[in-house]
Amino acid sequence: MDNSKQATLELGTKPVGKLLMQYALPAIAAMTAASLYNMTDSIFIGQGCGALAISGLAVTFPLQNLAAAFGAGVGVGASTCISVKLGQKDYATAERVFGNAFTLNVIIGVAFSIISLLFLNPILRFFGASDATLPYAREYMVITLAGNAISHMFFGMNAILRAASKPRSAMMASIMTVVLNAILSPIFIWPLHMGIGGAALATIIAQAAVLCWQLRIFSNPQCIVHFKRGIYRPVSHIIKNIIAIGISPFAMNACSCIVIIFINKALTFHGGDLAVGAFGITNKIAFIFIMINMGMNQGMFPIAGYNYGARNYDRLLRVLKYTMTGAVLITTVGWVIAQTMSYECARLFTSDETLIRISERAIIVTMLTFPLVGAQMASTGFFQSIGKAKISMLLSLSRQLLFFLPALLVLPNFYKTDGVWLAQPISDVISFVVAIVLLTKYVKKFKAAQAEGTAV
């Protein structure tokens, strides 16, 4: 038996705690690296291009999230399908899923770029760009969209690396992009005077370089899923499965796009361009801990998917317990930092005291109930990892749309800018309750099925 298949079989035999550490730590390191890579870009832009550049960058968030929605949908959908098929020992179908995911990433990445570039100015205006911030937002997005297919491929291949029992390779890919971006971005912004566009170019170059390394890994026949003839032609039932499972992360990112549009418009109306910039800074701070939690979830995905496919529900529930505990601890650390070091966090991004003051308030209020977010994310990830797409999508929508948007539409009428900040903690509390109710119901089902030897 080759090493890849042996590593895959360990998903059903190795102690769950050690296994989660083995998969989650590299994923956490990778996601931490990705969040730092995202944050350092903003720091370089804020310190090198000014407060309005930070606001211009914040205006691009909806479009970036929409692009990420398609990439996440394909990447997570494909990696979950691959994990389940490997658990069922169906290696041929796992490879076919890999090939179809590769094709989807290329098609969607290119199509999204073309459509967005054709209507870029109206899109950015709709997303909240003012006369002052539009030039920054446009300069950044023209370059980002030109390399969008590269970004799709990079993130998609990383998700599949984890499903193919190569979490360390996925971690290294993320770390390498951070290092390359951290080297190139300040060079492009300061010595080469390329401004915010230089930061975007550094990102694309870093991703392209590491994508070449990822493709080399998948060119090795020893990898449990690898490039070969006959796996790229789209197969309808495989595409449907990828989309069905990937609809949850797609919905999460797409909802972020919708919500951020409303946030930007509310902040522009009640607080101006600097309030939009403060939201951008707050987003980056929270994003670090959200991404670390996503790393926990990604560590859980192959373990939960494999054991669900193998009907080993005792191991399935154990990985859920460990993931939930870790997720809550992570977001609790984020909450402590937000409540005690908000000034220092804001100061990283800008020297503009007005922007710092607005950002302080935003960080404290927005992250008021942040520990609950960890539990909600772990629940969503669990349902996603076992292919319960509808429940996972419901939980994704509940936090970012169903509860958040009504609060966002109502509260600013009474509390102005503070109302925008308050909408998030209120939504977090309600969505946490919904997640725990659904999770408790399914935990009981799995325990009963384990005792009776039946399938869920």
Positions of PLM-derived features:
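Short alpha-helical transmembrane segments in multi-pass integral membrane proteins
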Residues: 1-24, 82-149, 180, 189-246, ...
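N-terminal transmembrane alpha-helices
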Residues: 11-49, 62-77, 81, 106-113, ...
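Transmembrane helical elements of multi-pass membrane transporters/channels
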Residues: 22-41, 143, 177, 206-210, ...
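Helix-terminus/linker motif at the lipid-water interface of multi-pass membrane proteins
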Residues: 36-55, 124-131, 187-193, 254-284, ...
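Alpha-helical transmembrane segments of multipass membrane proteins
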Residues: 39-42, 114, 122, 156-160, ...
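Small-residue-rich hydrophobic transmembrane alpha-helices
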Residues: 54-114, 151-170, 278-336, 340-342, ...
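Short runs within selected transmembrane alpha-helices of multi-pass transporters and secretion channels
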Residues: 75, 144-162, 170-181, 199-212, ...
